[in-house]
Amino acid sequence: MPQYRSRTSTHGRNMAGARALWRATGMGDADFGKPIIAIANSFTQFVPGHVHLKDLGQLVAREIEAAGGVAKEFNTIAVDDGIAMGHGGMLYSLPSRELIADAVEYMVNAHCADALVCISNCDKITPGMLMAAMRLNIPTIFVSGGPMEAGKYIADGETRAADLITAMVVAADPTKTDEQAAVMERSACPTCGSCSGMFTANSMNCLTEALGLALPGNGSLLATHADRKRLFVEAGWQIVDLARRYYEQDDEGVLPRRIGGFKAFENAMSLDIAMGGSTNTVLHLLAAAREAELDFTMADIDRLSRRVPNLCKVSPSVSNVHMEDVHRAGGIMGILGALDRAGLIHRDCATVHEKTIGEAIDRWDVMRGGETAKTLYSAAPGGVRTTEAFSQSRRYESLDLDREKGVIRDAEHAFSKDGGLAVLYGNIALDGAIVKTAGVDASILVFEGPARIFESQEDAVAGILGDRVKAGDVVLIRYEGPKGGPGMQEMLYPTSYLKSKGLGKSCALITDGRFSGGTAGLSIGHISPEAAQGGAIGLVEEGDIIAIDIPNRKLDVKLDEATLEARRAAMEAKGKAAWKPAARERVVSAALQAYAALTTSAANGAVRDVTQVQRGR
């Protein structure tokens, strides 16, 4: 029978000093026998997805204590990728994931907490906390801040939906007036919450449901809706129950690695492919699997992408569907239900709220569940600008239950037989590359064009806005991988500017960097190995023909092996200047240099490899 971890610091005469300090936090004699539950909050006034979280940690804390536990809250950092986008701030986004994972580990292990509630929301916070949960392997529940309401604006007498990407594209469109750009800017992000499309934040919060680590509705129930409060209340009670089951009943089935096993990761990836989630989710699932000591790889993602259909298209893949629309159609349990009917879900995986994910689907899929499920998914946007959580209680008059032409489709009515994400391989992507196929127009699934080479995101932006890119070109941005950036910047501005220039359906963009969840179009990222690690993307020259074949999962430069080997020899002959951008001025801080020294390929989730340090001793 496992002992409560917290008793290391609360029991025994020699822990009098520690107990004295615990008492100074408000604990008394009766508390020293209770489970101590850590609450990892991520409140910050920098990020709209986190601005409303300040009081939610204490909401969970009150419920934990009512359930018989002791709650102790702490905070992590949280970077807003949208605000950090397009300048040097983006170098810090992916590295912050590792810092968040470490911060949670440090606080939980330093204070011997027994269990964990993760209050996350945006791009790197949920992945960082997920990595920590798998690393620590103590009872854990995720409850996120929830999605933002979609923006609304009037055009041609009609009300239309908008989001951050809409504002960026309009601002860069020379045919739009300053007034039009200002209207879109003020309309795009009306409330607190994670940006309203199927971008990275919402994708990851949806995946925690499929992994079994979050309650139904976590990924799609709006931040502003009063119903979301229930998730925080239930999380507080449920985590105490999980802690008691593990420490008092020796039930290892409640641990993250048992809930989030290999089959659960397959479920999560199948959901991701079906809903056309952000390509960043591939990085994060690979990283979390590594922390869980699972052999879940790009090969598994490739295998799943060939059998799981695309059942849902959400912004940025389409402009008129946002998370609030997914929720009205049944949310993540609705998509999992459609996958289940097609035999594409492992029903026997455990969850933190039901015995199995199969039982959860039976209860919460609106196509088979009862009134409780229908009530949950009737929560609607309030249409009022606010930064307050749970501030409105509007409901839809009806749900979207159309599985033929609705927001969520059944497998027989899928948007495409192949899923919304795909892994490509070829002579410039020996270890793979990722594309969000859900966002690619059918006319350019097969594409060839001359490479237009840029060795930084900044140069690519200047080239696109300076009309150096034409229809039919392949924009190639390199030395932006995990090591080469460092930090693997997102290329949202280049892809958005291609759209604003009218090139969104006539150009491709390939990179060893990554993309925002807001990116759509023929955008291929995570090319591995990256240029800074000797990847062949570093050997491509201006005008070389790039061949893309998504149906056959191919990405190549049309050069023979002898030519590539000759170029590789010439590159290696440069000595210390080899595999570095020819002319790029970029200040790289000591913190980022430390990240670059330990990080690994995108094909491995860009996780740290500390054996590099051990080998150097």
UniProtKB/Swiss-Prot annotation:
Catalytic activity: (2R)-2,3-dihydroxy-3-methylbutanoate = 3-methyl-2-oxobutanoate + H2O; (2R,3R)-2,3-dihydroxy-3-methylpentanoate = (S)-3-methyl-2-oxopentanoate + H2O
GO terms classed as biological process: isoleucine biosynthetic process; L-valine biosynthetic process
GO molecular function: 2 iron, 2 sulfur cluster binding; dihydroxy-acid dehydratase activity; magnesium ion binding
UniProt cross-references to InterPro entries, sorted A to Z: Dihydro-acid_dehy_C (IPR042096), DihydroxyA_deHydtase (IPR004404), DiOHA_6PGluconate_deHydtase_CS (IPR020558), ILV_EDD_C (IPR056740), ILV_EDD_N (IPR000581), IlvD/EDD_N (IPR037237)
Residues that coordinate or bind Mg(2+): D81, D123, K124, E490
Position of the signal peptide: none
Record PTM N6-carboxylysine, positions in chain: K124
Cofactor needs: [2Fe-2S] cluster; Mg(2+)
Pathway where this protein functions: Amino-acid biosynthesis; L-isoleucine biosynthesis; L-isoleucine from 2-oxobutanoate: step 3/4; Amino-acid biosynthesis; L-valine biosynthesis; L-valine from pyruvate: step 3/4
GO cellular component: cytosol
Residues that, per the record, bind [2Fe-2S] cluster: C122, C195
Recorded superkingdom: Bacteria
Known role: Functions in the biosynthesis of branched-chain amino acids. Catalyzes the dehydration of (2R,3R)-2,3-dihydroxy-3-methylpentanoate (2,3-dihydroxy-3-methylvalerate) into 2-oxo-3-methylpentanoate (2-oxo-3-methylvalerate) and of (2R)-2,3-dihydroxy-3-methylbutanoate (2,3-dihydroxyisovalerate) into 2-oxo-3-methylbutanoate (2-oxoisovalerate), the penultimate precursor to L-isoleucine and L-valine, respectively.
Family of the protein in this entry: Belongs to the IlvD/Edd family.
The name this protein goes by in its record: Dihydroxy-acid dehydratase
